[in-house]
A protein has these predicted regions:
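Hydrophobic helical h-region of N-terminal Sec-dependent signal peptides
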Residues: 8-12
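N-terminal signal peptide c-region/cleavage motif recognized by signal peptidases
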Residues: 15-17
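Conserved C-terminal helix/tail region of periplasmic/extracytoplasmic solute-binding proteins
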Residues: 303-354
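Short linear loop/turn motifs
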Residues: 57, 161-163, 270-279, 324-336
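Secondary-structure end/capping motifs
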Residues: 227-320
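Bacterial N-terminal signal peptides that target proteins for export
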Residues: 1-7
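Short, glycine-/small- and polar/acidic-enriched structural segments
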Residues: 21-177, 181-187, 198, 203, ...
Length: 354
């Protein structure tokens, strides 16, 4: 799906003459699909952004490396990148990026290594002398992927190789055809692969990385200082949208398709709808709940987990040291505001939505 279809959809929240809305542009590193784009669509259709005084549009840049300068220069309001490039900026010898994360969008490790079920590869160590497919060699996730392999005793570039295979279908075909021995995609893409009928085996990252956050919403430090309420309102609307999609995933999927008709599958009332709601529900389960079933605090960062992961990255040679100001990069300042809304009233709206 080309994300250009999503941009005009999310730009429909136009300020009325009676109510001026604050324009917010959010930069993504990859196009949204139904499993991660449905909450945005739900927020638009139910007027959640508008109720928070926001007119939200989305743009896509090719990876975190292209996205981050847009936020740093204030050409966009918020971004949704992985954190490794931001952390790395503290080791550049120059001024670090003037950016801070304010919302933990993926509070557990979403990346995994995927092999075909019949593959002899069962552990990370088994990837020795193998080829691993990634979307592009510029992905901001690759430092963490390399670190995971080093923790398992491998040496990327010497006895294991990353290969660019593109995303989704092209990568799936690369694995099926034997062009690569494994894929390094996120878990939702693994779900999509399974729903094509292919039996796969998933290999998790080392434990130190399992609760390390992935993508999150980030803003310029000036926005924290000059317009903190903008952050609160956006984070609240996004939290509300995830809540709606947990209650009524069918509505959220169909909202995404209505606003992105090119993404609508042929069997949108049958198997296509079932698969899409499965993808969305699985993702929300991972994002909203811990492995033990307890509910996460929306948007919150576990700074101790992050410090341990940075330490492991440093030991693996991906960072020159673990000496970074974690509490400056990742902020929980606005977390109490994100779920400050009438959940019973929103549940009623979600259940009635069609």
């Amino acid at each position: 799906m080309q994300f250009k279809y999503l941009v005009p959809m999310l730009a429909l929240a136009v300020a009325s003459p009676a109510l001026a809305l604050d324009d917010v542009t959010v930069a993504l590193a990859i196009p949204a699909a139904v499993h991660d784009g449905a909450p945005y669509a739900a927020a638009e259709e139910l007027g959640l952004f508008k109720e928070q005084g926001l007119s939200v549009s989305f743009v896509v840049f090719q990876g975190a490396g292209a996205l981050l300068p847009q936020v740093a220069s204030k050409r966009v309001t918020f971004g949704y990148p992985v954190s490794e490039p931001v952390i790395s900026s503290y080791f550049s010898g120059k001024d670090p990026l003037p950016l801070r994360y304010f919302y933990n969008g993926t509070p557990s490790q979403t990346l995994e290594y995927t092999v075909l079920e019949e593959s002899p590869i069962r552990t990370l160590a088994d990837l020795k002398d193998r080829k691993i497919g990634v979307g592009a060699l510029t992905w901001g996730t690759i430092p963490n992927s390399r670190a995971a392999l080093r923790v398992a005793g491998l040496e990327p570039g010497k006895n294991v190789e990353f290969v660019a295979v593109g995303v989704l279908g092209s990568g799936f075909q690369a694995l099926r055809s034997g062009q690569v021995d494994a894929l390094n995609y996120n878990s939702s893409w693994g779900d999509i692969f399974e729903l094509t009928g292919t039996k796969i085996r998933r290999i998790a990252y080392p434990e130190v990385f399992l609760e390390n956050p992935g993508n999150g919403f980030i803003a310029h430090e000036d926005t924290f200082r000059d317009n903190p309420d903008l952050i609160r309102r956006f984070g609240r609307a996004y939290t509300q949208a995830q809540y709606v999609c947990e209650i009524n995933p069918t509505f959220c999927v169909q909202a995404f398709w209505r606003q992105n008709p090119e993404s609508r599958p042929a069997d949108a009332e049958g198997k296509g709808l079932e698969n899409a709601t499965t993808l969305l529900t699985r993702r929300l389960q991972r994002m909203l709940y811990r492995p033990d079933g307890t509910r996460r605090q929306p948007g919150e960062y576990d700074l101790d987990v992050i410090r341990k992961a940075i330490g492991a990255m440093a030991e693996a040679g991906e960072f020159p040291s673990a000496d970074v100001p974690v509490d400056r990069i990742f902020s929980n300042e606005f977390v109490p505001a994100f779920d400050d809304f009438d959940k019973d009233a929103l549940r009623q709206r979600a259940e009635a939505a069609q």
